[in-house]
Swiss-Prot record:
Enzyme Commission code: 2.7.8.7
Keywords, in A-Z order: Cytoplasm, Fatty acid biosynthesis, Fatty acid metabolism, Lipid biosynthesis, Lipid metabolism, Magnesium, Metal-binding, Transferase
Transmembrane region(s): none
Cell membrane in keyword set: no
Catalytic activity: apo-[ACP] + CoA = holo-[ACP] + adenosine 3',5'-bisphosphate + H(+)
Organism: Maridesulfovibrio salexigens (strain ATCC 14822 / DSM 2638 / NCIMB 8403 / VKM B-1763)
Entry GO MF terms: holo-[acyl-carrier-protein] synthase activity; magnesium ion binding
Job of this protein: Transfers the 4'-phosphopantetheine moiety from coenzyme A to a Ser of acyl-carrier-protein.
Protein name (record): Holo-[acyl-carrier-protein] synthase
Pfam families recorded: ACPS (PF01648)
Localization of this protein: Cytoplasm
Length: 124
């Protein structure tokens, strides 16, 4: 049974402006150290934008937004061996998912020329 659903779309230009203005500080604000290690050197904007959208979608699926101790650092997007994204909840986000009875987490991330988008589904 679906108990949480979130979707987000992010403009690549918005993320590019933030990266240009704040550089590494911006990435460190929204990404975990493990996510930062995977930023592609050649074109980081789609990667960062996709993770931003994924985290926004995740907090919508949790029903909290970025509140109750849930931050960008309590949500982490890693990769499976297949290359598919994997959503991990940490800290307060993990506590919230457990209190909801989350047993399954599904995530889809995409990006095009101008936008990045993500959908998160939480199952019981």
């Amino acid at each position: 049974m679906i108990i949480g659903l979130g979707i987000d779309i992010t403009e690549l230009d918005r993320i590019k402006r933030s990266l240009d203005k704040y550089g590494e500080r911006f990435a460190e604000k929204i990404l975990t150290p493990a996510e930062i290690e995977l930023i592609p050197a050649k074109n980081p904007v789609p990667y960062v934008a996709a993770r931003f959208a994924a985290k926004e979608a995740a907090v919508k699926a949790l029903g909290t937004g970025f509140a109750e101790g849930i931050t960008f650092h309590t949500i982490e997007i890693t990769r499976l061996d297949s290359g598919a994204p994997q959503l991990n909840f940490l800290g307060k986000a993990l506590e919230r998912s457990k209190s909801m009875g989350v047993e399954g987490i599904h995530i889809s991330i995409t990006h095009g020329r101008d936008t990045a988008a993500a959908v998160v589904v939480l199952e019981k």
